[in-house]
């Protein structure tokens, strides 16, 4: 056991009104986790964490802990907060294979999960534990979604997702890789074959454009495409990155590891939108930052930039007469992603909302009865823990829906 993990656990004050738990989007019982850890009840602690958050191992690595649990720790008022993420990671990771998921008796009903990202995995695990026969349909060859194809391995090792695949197969969950619903196989086909309910968790994979000249040039890449397979992209010796969220930090830090000598992130405002930890890690890796700058055009050998200012109403505008050229070998656009809508195009019962994401009601049901959705396909690009938080509620709603329709023919 790493010494610092035990030292951090001993720093916990076991607050009667734990602010750390209030800071967690899924209300992880952090004091109880630490108490069990100190009493050497690791497997009990791991089972508790998994029951509350099936993606506990992942979240312990990629959550914005400085804003959530650790950011609310009272120890942080006059010093450093308890390093809760290290404790959670040690427990969840070391005991993962030994966690015994409580499984209800099979109830004879099937549910389909479309998409094996954070939302889909959460739904599949929770419904399988309730006795449903689950099949996951995934367009790629492995599970993980954005966790595998959008988060660098130095932040989230792919081996963790492979272990999740093994765990899910042990739970009886079936997996159809390299298979896209919409087109040859429709949602109606799934209902015809006896699936009582369908979950859509297809994520947000379409890059948001900057809508400036030069965006189609060969030296321009989108963050989601680059992070999918960095080894296939030659960025040259210098890269300009536009956008300052966690994806931009992932691109910048990956580029450094790929040998790019000059990596610069440009942000229109005076601070990044990434988590403070990711920002600091990027600076430590050697990433440069330029604020109050925006791209107006991309050239074959660089970018045209203009200085910006933030008005009183919060709107960012360019300063006239400040346009200047900055040379670089390549450009990466990291200004978020939006969902693709193949399913909507092939299923008239599904509708979009005013934001261009899949429309659902307060219970997560889409405009097509029996079809539910959550995660980035509904909210736009969010975090793993956000997907888990909403998907836990959706799993309960799907369970209630299927129980209410269990006697329907081909429901």
Kindly give the residue locations of the regions a language model identified:
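Ferredoxin-type iron-sulfur electron-transfer modules and their immediate structural context
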Residues: 1-110, 200-217, 287, 299-301, ...
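Residue-level detector of alpha-helix initiation sites
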Residues: 54, 117-118, 142, 245-247, ...
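Glycine-rich dinucleotide-binding loop and its adjacent helix/turn
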Residues: 88-104, 163-183, 206-258, 352-367
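N-terminal Rossmann-like FAD-binding beta1-loop-alpha1 element of flavoenzymes
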Residues: 109-135, 248-256
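Rossmann-like dinucleotide-binding cores of NAD(P)H-dependent redox enzymes
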Residues: 136, 140-171, 175, 252-296, ...
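A conserved short coil-to-beta-strand element within the FAD-binding core of flavoproteins
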Residues: 177-193, 292-302, 308-309
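FAD-site-proximal beta/loop scaffold in flavoenzymes
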Residues: 216-236, 313-381
């Amino acid at each position: 056991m790493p010494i610092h993990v035990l030292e951090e656990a001993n720093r916990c004050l076991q607050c009667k009104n734990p602010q750390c738990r209030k800071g967690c989007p899924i209300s992880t019982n952090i004091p109880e986790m630490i108490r069990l850890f100190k009493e050497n009840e690791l497997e009990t602690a791991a089972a508790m964490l998994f029951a509350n958050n099936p993606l506990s191992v992942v979240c312990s690595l990629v959550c914005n802990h400085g804003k959530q649990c650790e950011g609310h720790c009272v120890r942080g008022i006059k010093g450093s907060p308890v390093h809760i993420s290290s404790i959670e990671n040690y427990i969840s990771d070391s005991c993962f294979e030994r966690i015994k998921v409580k499984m209800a008796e099979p109830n004879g009903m099937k549910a389909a999960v479309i998409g094996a990202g954070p939302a889909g995995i959460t739904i599949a695990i929770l419904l399988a534990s309730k006795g449903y026969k689950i099949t996951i349909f995934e367009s790629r060859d492995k599970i993980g979604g954005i966790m595998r194809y959008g988060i660098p391995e130095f932040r989230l090792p792919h081996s963790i997702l492979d272990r999740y695949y093994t765990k899910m197969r042990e739970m009886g969950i079936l997996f159809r890789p390299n298979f896209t619903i919409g087109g040859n196989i429709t949602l109606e086909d799934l209902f015809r074959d006896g699936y009582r309910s369908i979950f859509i968790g297809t994520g947000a994979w379409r890059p948001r454009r900057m809508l400036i000249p030069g965006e189609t040039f060969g030296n321009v890449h989108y963050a989601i495409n680059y992070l999918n397979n960095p080894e296939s992209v030659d960025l040259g010796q210098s890269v300009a990155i536009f956008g300052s969220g966690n994806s931009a930090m992932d691109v910048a830090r990956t580029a450094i590891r790929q040998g790019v000598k000059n990596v610069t992130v440009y942000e229109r405002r005076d601070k990044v939108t990434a988590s403070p930890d990711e920002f600091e890690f990027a600076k430590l890796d050697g990433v440069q930052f330029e604020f109050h700058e925006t791209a107006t055009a991309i050239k074959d050998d660089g970018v045209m930039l203009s200085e910006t200012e933030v008005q009183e109403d919060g709107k960012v505008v360019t300063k006239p007469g400040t346009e200047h050229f900055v040379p670089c070998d390549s450009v990466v656009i990291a200004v978020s992603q939006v969902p693709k809508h193949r399913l909507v195009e092939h299923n008239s019962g599904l509708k979009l909302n005013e934001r261009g994401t899949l429309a659902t009601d307060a219970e997560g049901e889409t405009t097509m009865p029996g079809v539910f959705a959550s995660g980035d396909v509904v909210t736009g690009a969010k975090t793993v823990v956000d997907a888990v938080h909403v998907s836990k509620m959706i799993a309960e709603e799907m369970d209630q829906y299927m129980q209410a329709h269990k006697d329907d023919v081909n429901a």
